[in-house]
């Protein structure tokens, strides 16, 4: 036995075994990865080895003390990566990417969120390191570097494992690396650590795209957006011409709370009533990615899709954009954003200059006291009340944007502000969520009253829009309880990406309200609002279309490649009936829309990575 690889390299073998087990345990318990087949389970089991084996194998080139130090450090680093991804996944249902690391400035404002997601059991992931340290102290014996033939055999096996992983990935999802909008599929197929390497390479390629871009790069994109343009409904074009715009972004607000009750009390009584006097959209989807609220701002302003990795507000703040703010400025509109948080959060102070916004009211412009604030900033009621007074001083017409805060993860609220009982389910987060949504709804009601008091209501177009989901897939069991379902399917998860979108034009929509049932998303907001203001968008490079146009093809694509039409929902490589939620026998029915979804996301990425709008007037 003395000549065996295990006997000579016990510390290495134990290090590999423990790291393999830890990674697989995190796959199963830390992430909500959908495993449908035995092949997918096999891939999940073996893919950690295709990274751990070659990395830890470096220890074969080192003598005993250096080898053990290297393996312990490698184990520690990979464990930290696992825990960091688990915490990140707990909120975003996503994995850390390189651009996210440049958002470290946000962490100072996220203390309560990280605390909510950190689990004491994470400490158990370091137990193997303690064992390895004790093992190293008790089993010291002279050791030289491994023989060349041993290293060759070891790396031959490592290469075989890597090739096996890639082959299985290709069988499961052909051309996976070429069409990588779905990070979950990448992690399931090639592994978490390998995904981080792939992401690093992708970001390097994206950075180089800007250097090699030229004026010809924008031509194909112009041709696509011009061909996809939908003419506005002339009966609605210019309905709000000359009016002020008051656009309120509703933090973490999803549509499933609308017209729902807890213990007989409505969660959103004000919005429920306002919908009856407005243009509202039943199948309106959030399309954000890792930038969350900042992504929703970006999408609305530009009618482009956000970056697949990181937040555009951080990674592309030096690029050129043809925002709605700039377009409306040509029609004498003054623009302002109100947000009672620090101006540097999400790099807003820099990006708002890039967007052409005239004025940014941040936390320093508001009167904030311990009693009127939360961990994220000023409470919604006080924020909107103070904002209404500031709004009156702006030059008119104006386009104003407000970003609420109280309904923010982890959805905590003072007892004095609680207007409804918590929901009763297996998720404390969902239980609290209904109370912060209820408070937000009451704050909106109060805001409308203040607008009337300030004389700003009648001559304005008032818009409410949810920015992104608040309750992630990690709480699907409780969500099924809320919705009265046995389980939440992938189809249901897509439906839960619906957010409120309400356009209220006093004197018009209260006389002729309308509920639009067609599929649409945040990318459609820019042309919809511009056309209501009487500003034509034909010729603009935008991927959205006027939601009120009868010429529009109902369609919404999420950033991960899932999409929705009036007939189909496509997600997790499966085509569903939009009406029934059942898996379709004819899976090819979704193919034409899948091509459209991939093309739009790819073209939008080219604009962002190449800074192509600098070549367009």
Swiss-Prot record:
Q: Which residues lie on this side of the membrane: Cytoplasmic?
A: 1-10, 63-68, 137-153
- The residue spans the entry assigns to the Extracellular side of the membrane are as follows 32-41, 90-115, 172-617
Spell out the subcellular localization from the entry: Cell membrane
The catalytic residues are 293
The residues that the entry says bind substrate are 408
Query: Which residues does the annotation say bind Mn(2+)?
Result: 251, 293, 467-468
Question: What Gene Ontology cellular-component terms does the record carry?
Answer: extracellular region; membrane; plasma membrane
Q: Where is this site: Cleavage?
A: 213-214
| Membrane topology category | Multi-pass membrane protein
Modification after translation is described as:
Proteolytically cleaved.
- Please give the CDD domains that the UniProt record associates with this protein: LTA_synthase (cd16015)
Any one Gene Ontology MF annotation carried by this entry is: transferase activity
List where the protein spans the membrane: 11-31, 42-62, 69-89, 116-136, 154-171
What are the record keywords, sorted? Cell membrane, Manganese, Membrane, Metal-binding, Secreted, Transmembrane, Transmembrane helix
Task: Output the InterPro entries linked to this UniProt entry.
Answer: Alkaline_phosphatase_core_sf, LtaS-like, OpgB/LTA_synthase_biosynth, Sulfatase_N
Q: What else is known?
A: Although its sequence similarity with the glycerol phosphate lipoteichoic acid synthase LtaS, it cannot restore staphylococcal growth and LTA synthesis after ltaS depletion.
Family, as annotated: Belongs to the LTA synthase family.
Indicate what this protein is called per its UniProt record.
Answer: Lipoteichoic acid synthase-like YvgJ
Q: What is the lineage of its organism?
A: Bacteria, Bacillati, Bacillota, Bacilli, Bacillales
Q: What is the primary gene name for this protein?
A: yvgJ
């Amino acid at each position: 036995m003395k000549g065996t690889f295990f006997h000579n390299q016990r510390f290495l073998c134990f290090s590999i075994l423990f790291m393999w087990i830890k990674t697989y345990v995190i796959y199963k318990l830390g992430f909500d990865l959908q495993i449908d087949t035995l092949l997918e389970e096999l891939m999940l089991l073996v893919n950690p080895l295709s990274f751990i084996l070659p990395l830890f194998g470096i220890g074969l080139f080192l003598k005993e003390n250096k080898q053990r130090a290297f393996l312990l450090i490698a184990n520690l680093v990979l464990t930290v990566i696992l825990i960091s991804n688990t915490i990140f996944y707990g909120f975003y249902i996503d994995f850390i990417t390189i651009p996210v690391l440049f958002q470290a400035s946000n962490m100072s404002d996220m203390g309560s969120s990280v605390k909510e997601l950190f689990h004491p059991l994470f400490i158990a992931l370091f137990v193997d390191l303690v064992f390895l340290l004790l093992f190293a102290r008790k089993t010291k014996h002279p050791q030289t570097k491994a023989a060349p033939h041993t290293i060759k055999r070891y790396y031959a096996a490592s290469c075989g494992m890597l090739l096996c992983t890639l082959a299985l990935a290709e069988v499961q999802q052909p051309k996976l690396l070429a069409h990588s909008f779905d990070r979950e599929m990448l992690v399931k197929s090639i592994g978490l650590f390998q995904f981080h390497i792939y992401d690093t390479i992708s970001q390097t390629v994206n950075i180089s795209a800007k250097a090699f871009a030229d004026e010809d790069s924008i031509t194909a994109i112009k041709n696509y957006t011009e061909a996809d343009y939908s003419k506005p409904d002339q009966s609605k074009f210019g309905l709000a011409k000359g009016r002020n715009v008051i656009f309120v972004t509703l933090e973490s607000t999803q549509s499933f709370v609308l017209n729902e009750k807890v213990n007989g009390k409505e969660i959103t009584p004000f919005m429920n009533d306002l919908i009856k006097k407005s243009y509202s959209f039943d199948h309106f989807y959030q399309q954000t990615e890792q930038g969350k609220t900042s992504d929703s701002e970006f999408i609305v302003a530009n009618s482009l899709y956000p970056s697949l990795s990181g937040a555009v507000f951080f990674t592309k703040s030096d690029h050129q954009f043809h925002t709605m703010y700039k377009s409306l400025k040509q029609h004498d509109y003054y623009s302002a954003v109100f947000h009672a948080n620090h101006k540097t959060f999400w790099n807003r102070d820099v990006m708002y200059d890039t967007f052409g916004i005239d004025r940014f009211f941040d936390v320093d412009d508001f009167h904030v006291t311990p009693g009127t604030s939360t961990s994220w900033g000023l409470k919604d009621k006080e924020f909107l009340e103070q904002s209404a007074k500031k709004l009156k001083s702006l030059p008119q017409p104006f386009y104003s944007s407000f970003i609420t805060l109280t309904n923010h993860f982890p959805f905590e609220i003072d007892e004095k502000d609680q207007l409804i009982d918590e929901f009763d389910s297996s998720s404390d987060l969902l239980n609290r969520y209904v109370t912060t949504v209820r408070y937000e709804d009451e704050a909106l009601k109060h805001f409308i009253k203040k607008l009337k008091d300030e004389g700003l209501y009648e001559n304005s177009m008032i818009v409410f829009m949810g920015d992104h989901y608040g309750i992630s897939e990690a709480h699907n069991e409780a969500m099924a309880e809320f919705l009265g379902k046995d389980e939440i399917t992938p189809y249901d998860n897509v439906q839960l990406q619906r957010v409120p979108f309400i356009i209220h034009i006093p004197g018009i929509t209260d006389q002729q309200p309308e509920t639009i049932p067609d599929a649409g998303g945040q990318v459609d907001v820019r042309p919809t609002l511009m056309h209501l203001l009487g500003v034509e968008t034909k010729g603009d490079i935008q991927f959205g279309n006027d939601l009120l146009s009868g010429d529009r093809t109902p369609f919404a694509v999420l950033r991960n490649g899932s999409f929705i039409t009036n007939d189909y929902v496509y997600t997790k490589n499966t085509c569903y009936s939009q009406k029934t939620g059942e898996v379709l026998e004819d899976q090819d029915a979704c193919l034409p829309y899948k091509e459209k979804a991939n093309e739009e996301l790819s073209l939008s990425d080219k604009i962002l990575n190449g800074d192509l709008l600098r070549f367009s007037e």
